[in-house]
C-alpha cells in the first residue's frame, strides 16, 4: 500500500471521529494496520489510552501492564527525555517496549518513540514496536502524522471535559440561586445531615430541629431535582432517599457556607 493511501486511511479515521467520543483503541488499530507494528498510545502519566498488537509478546509483566492499562512510572517519566521522534531503538535502550528480562528472545526487537504534542504541550507518547523489521522513513511519516491526529483528539477530549465542567457548575449555580433564603438554609442542613453524596433523611425531624416547615424542605428538594442536581425518592415512613447527581453541587454549597 502506497504512503498516500495510508495517509488517507489515517485521515478518514480523523473524519469518522468528528463529534463522537474519542476512541483511542480504534486509532491504535488503524495505526497498527498502516504501519504494521504494535501500537501503544500512552498519556502523560503513563495511562494506556489505547493499544493494538500486531506481533504478540509472550510475557507475564507485559500482559499485566496491558490489563492494568498502565505503563511503569519510571519508564513514563523517562519518555519526557525524548523531545522528538527517536526511531529503531534496540532492546538495550531504556526506551525499549520489549521486556528486558527476556532480552534473549527479543534481540532483534525495535522500538520507535514519537512524542504526542498539542497546543504547545506534551500530551503523551506514541510507542511503536516490531520484532525485527526496521522502521523506514514512510513508517516514521505515518507515525508522526498519527501522533498529530491523536494529539488533536486528546485536546478535543480535554476541551469537552472543560465545557462539561463549566456546564455542571452553571446548572448548580442557577439551581441554588432559585432557592429562597429559608430553602437554602434547609438544603444546607439536609446535606450536613447526609454527610456525603447520598443517604436517607426524615424531613420532619430536620424541620423540627431547624425550626422551619416541612413544606420548605419539600420545595427546596423539588427545585434541585427539577434542575437535575439531585434525585429523591420517598420511602414512606423511613424517610426520603436523596442522591447528588451533579458533583459540583456539594462544592458550591461548601463555598456558600465559607462566604
UniProtKB/Swiss-Prot annotation:
Q: Which GO terms describe its cellular component?
A: cytoplasm; protein-DNA complex
Q: Where does the record place it?
A: Cytoplasm
What outcome is documented for mutating residue 98 to A in this protein? Strongly affects the ilvB repressing activity in a BCAA-containing medium. DNA binding is stimulated by GTP, but not by branched-chain amino acids
Activity regulation here?
Activity of CodY is modulated by interaction with two types of effectors: the branched-chain amino acids (BCAAs) leucine, isoleucine and valine, which are signals of the nutritional status of the cell, and GTP, which may signal the energetic status of the cell. During growth in a nutrient-rich medium, the concentrations of these effectors are high, and CodY, once activated by binding to these effectors, shows an increased affinity for its target promoters. GTP and the BCAAs act additively to increase the affinity of CodY for DNA.
Asked if the Swiss-Prot or TrEMBL record annotates the protein with the keyword Nucleotide-binding, the reply is yes
Gene3D superfamilies from the entry?
3.30.450.40, Winged helix-like DNA-binding domain superfamily/Winged helix DNA-binding domain
Which segments carry the region annotation GAF domain? 2-155
Keyword field: Activator, Cytoplasm, DNA-binding, GTP-binding, Nucleotide-binding, Phosphoprotein, Repressor, Transcription, Transcription regulation
Chief subcellular site?
A: cytoplasm
Q: Where does GTP bind?
A: 51, 69
**Ranges in a coiled coil:** none
Q: Which residues carry this modification: Phosphoserine?
A: 215
Summarize the impact of residue 71 to E: Loss of ilvB repressing activity in a BCAA-containing medium. DNA binding is stimulated by GTP, but not by branched-chain amino acids
DNA-binding region, residue intervals: 203-222
Which residues are the signal sequence here?
none
What Gene Ontology molecular function terms does this protein carry? DNA-binding transcription repressor activity; GTP binding; transcription cis-regulatory region binding
Q: What outcome is documented for mutating residue 218 to A in this protein? A: No change in affinity for ilvB and dpp promoters
Name the family the entry cites. Answer: Belongs to the CodY family.
Q: What does the entry's domain section say?
A: Modular protein made up of an N-terminal effector binding GAF-type domain and a C-terminal wHTH DNA binding domain, separated by a helical linker. The GAF domain is involved in the formation of homodimers. Amino acid binding to the GAF domain is associated with drastic but localized changes in structure. Structural changes upon isoleucine binding may lead to increased affinity of Ile-bound CodY for its target DNA.
The entry describes its oligomerization and partners as: Homodimer. Homotetramer. Homodimer under physiological conditions, but homotetramers are observed in the crystals.
The cross-references to HAMAP family, in alphabetical order and at most eight, read: HTH_type_CodY
Q: What does this protein do?
A: DNA-binding global transcriptional regulator which is involved in the adaptive response to starvation and acts by directly or indirectly controlling the expression of numerous genes in response to nutrient availability. During rapid exponential growth, CodY is highly active and represses genes whose products allow adaptation to nutrient depletion.
Protein name, entry field = Global transcriptional regulator CodY
Chain's gene name: codY
